[in-house]
Regions:
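Hydrophobic alpha-helical hairpins/lids featuring a short glycine-rich hinge
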Residues: 49-66, 73
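A conserved non-catalytic segment of reverse transcriptases
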Residues: 146, 235-305, 309
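Charged boundary/loop elements
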Residues: 1, 68-78
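Short helix/loop capping segments that flank catalytic or ligand/cofactor-binding pockets
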Residues: 48, 59-60, 117-119, 218-219, ...
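Conserved polymerase palm-domain catalytic core
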Residues: 16, 23-27, 32-33, 37, ...
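Structural motif
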Residues: 50-54, 58, 132-136, 168, ...
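Non-catalytic, polymerase-adjacent accessory regions of viral genome-replication enzymes
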Residues: 1-13
């Protein structure tokens, strides 16, 4: 579960991989316990970090690649997170372009509360069955969902919800879940019931929806709460808001954060509306704290080496 385990596994890599393949083929493979460590976050909170066994990581990588090949043709253009050749930078660029168009006047900024730990296993498996009829393949995924979590105090927890902690397969499973829960629903149902322009930009469980009309945004938000509840999810109220966001109302000085950037309307030197974007204050503060800790740790190094590390 650590660097030493990886080195030991690599010493007999071919033999270990062959043994793993044989276990999968014979149906004797068992997912190992996932070691969970707690990492400090800004503000004194802790976040869990799952560390799967090396063999499980390798097998999950193979399964993730297969899922990617199946679902990339299904995923919609509004989904940006954890996809090949699609980055957070593209999400920011596309969102900026849409907002600059002037078609939208209201923004719903939303985040799903504890999303990765709240995914319903049975509902996720039902979604996978829609596209995959290979029972042994699906059984592998079920094993990882149910794999025990080993706490640092020796306690073993068997999760009833959520994607595999620290698992390579977790991001694409999360995308598949929200593809059905949010993306398709937004494009097929929400769009049909709105009277104006609408737009969705989602990166994992963080998303922004833009609307031409306030009444559409208000109806959407009410429907969103009900929709998420059907799948065992809820919005994080402290990270969710409905705001007027229009080039026609620059004086409102409204703003929202998405993927580490703050968006707001302002005016240029000629007094014309302009969409402004800058690093969000929370993101900047976190980066400064991280840099300060790094600098204190390395301040004793010679300047030449220190500057090389900074570059």
């Amino acid at each position: 579960m650590d660097r030493l385990d990886a080195i030991a596994y690599e010493d007999n890599l071919i033999g270990n991989v062959q043994q793993l393949a044989q276990q999968v083929k014979e149906g004797t493979y068992r997912a190992k316990l996932v070691l969970r460590k707690w990492i400090p976050k800004l503000g004194g909170k802790l976040r869990p970090l799952g560390i799967p066994a090396i063999a499980d990581k390798l097998l999950q990588l193979a399964v993730a690649k297969i899922l990617e090949a199946i679902y990339e043709q299904d995923f919609l253009s509004c989904s940006y997170g954890y996809r090949p050749r699609i980055s957070a930078h593209k999400a920011i660029k596309d969102l900026t372009g849409e907002l600059k168009s002037g078609k939208y006047h209201v923004v719903v900024e939303a985040d799903i509360k504890g999303f990765f730990n709240a995914i319903n296993h049975d509902l996720l498996m039902d979604m996978l069955v829609r596209r995959i009829d290979d029972k042994p393949f699906l059984k592998l995924i079920r094993k990882w969902l149910k794999a025990g979590i080993l706490e640092t105090d020796g306690q073993v927890i068997h999760p009833l919800m959520g994607t595999p902690q620290g698992g390579i397969v977790s991001p694409i499973l999360a995308n598949i879940y929200l593809h059905y829960v949010l993306d398709m629903w937004f494009e097929e149902i929400v769009r049909a019931h709105c009277t104006g322009h609408i737009y969705l930009c989602r990166y994992a469980d963080d998303f922004v929806c833009a609307f031409q009309y306030s009444k559409d945004a208000q109806r959407f938000y009410k429907a969103l709460i009900q929709r998420l509840a059907r799948f065992g999810l809820e919005v994080a109220e402290d990270k969710t808001q409905i705001i007027e966001f229009s080039h026609c109302k620059v004086r409102a000085k409204t703003k929202f954060d998405f993927l580490g950037f703050e968006f707001r309307w302002g005016v240029n030197r000629w007094g014309k509306p302009i969409l402004k974007r800058r690093t969000s204050r929370d993101k900047l503060r976190a980066s400064l704290v991280k840099f300060k800790a790094w600098f204190q740790k390395h301040s004793g190094l010679p300047k030449k080496i220190l500057f090389a590390k900074l570059n």
